[in-house]
Design a protein with these regions (language model features):
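A short helix->loop->beta-strand "cap" motif at the edges of active sites that frequently abuts
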Residues: 21-28, 75-76
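Conserved beta-loop-beta element that borders a ligand/cofactor-binding pocket
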Residues: 33, 65-90
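A conserved pocket-lining segment of Rossmann-fold NAD(P)-dependent short-chain dehydrogenase/reductase
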Residues: 102-123, 135
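NAD(P)H-binding glycine-rich loop region in Rossmannoid oxidoreductase-like domains
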Residues: 1-24
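Mid/C-terminal beta-alpha module of Rossmann-like enzyme folds, strongest
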Residues: 131-194, 209, 214, 220-224, ...
Length: 244
């Protein structure tokens, strides 16, 4: 999450990768996020304009622009695969995984950033990996940007209600308001790093992946319900034993 690391190293790393791909005739498939998109409720498409503010957003926009430029270069095949916030099994790292799912797994109160009423679009990490592999192995998918496929958007409140149904128990949660993050960031570096990303949580997040879905209509997107079954499979057995 260290912004200075992003600022000083990420573009250099990308340049090295581009040059290595050119020298070895390798194709470049770049996994990207949505930091460079405008942080409001405007629906996000592959050709949405970059409107960014902050170190991370700026770095990501520059990297994406660099790759788009290379898409015109006949010496390299480039593809950008873009995804919204992750959620997933094992050690998946994301704000929602850390503050919601992992805390519920550990019988802690979930912490929801800014609002439990705005729509969130999340991508299941195994789906993201499979979709990238599928795109990478097609002859006609390079030199363009793709939004990776996601299930329907939900509010945090809707997610928690479904979790309660799955776990057969109440899920406690607390909404962390903007002023709380502002105060905490004075004393905590991790909260300082998080502040740049918070504006997106004030609005419905509308990430459109219709381009992918039309190209691959048979691709099976993991539903949020099925993802929860995976995330909480051990906990489900535990709570079942407790109820006896």
């Amino acid at each position: 999450m260290d912004s200075e690391q992003w600022k000083t190293k990420f573009e250099i790393m990308l340049e090295n990768v581009i040059q290595a791909c050119k020298e070895t005739k390798a194709k470049l498939v770049f996994f990207d996020n949505t930091y460079m998109y405008e942080k409001n409720d405007t629906e996000q498409f592959e050709d949405s304009k970059f409107i960014y503010d902050g170190i991370k957003s700026t770095v990501r926009a520059k990297m994406a622009d660099r790759l788009v430029t290379e898409m015109e270069n006949p010496d390299i095949d480039v593809m950008i695969c873009r995804a919204p916030e992750f959620y997933g099994p094992n050690k998946t790292q994301s704000i929602t995984n850390s503050l919601l799912f992992n805390r519920v797994k550990n019988d802690k109160t979930a912490l929801l950033p800014i609002s439990d009423q705005t729509l969130r679009t999340l991508i299941w990490t195994p789906d993201a990996s499979k979709a990238m592999a599928l795109l990478a192995n097609q002859p006609d998918t390079y030199n363009q940007t793709w939004h990776l496929p996601c299930d329907v958007s939900r509010t945090y409140e809707e997610m928690i209600k479904l979790m309660e149904e799955k776990l057969h128990k109440p899920v406690k949660y607390k909404v962390i308001k903007q002023w709380m993050f502002d105060l905490g960031s004075i004393f905590n570096k991790n909260m300082q790093e998080l502040k740049e990303l918070l504006p997106r949580y004030h609005y419905d997040n509308k990430f459109n992946s219709d381009k992918f879905k039309k190209k691959f209509p048979d691709f099976e997107i993991t539903t949020f319900s099925n993802a929860l079954d995976d995330l909480f499979k051990l906990e489900k057995k535990y709570y079942s034993r407790k109820k006896r």
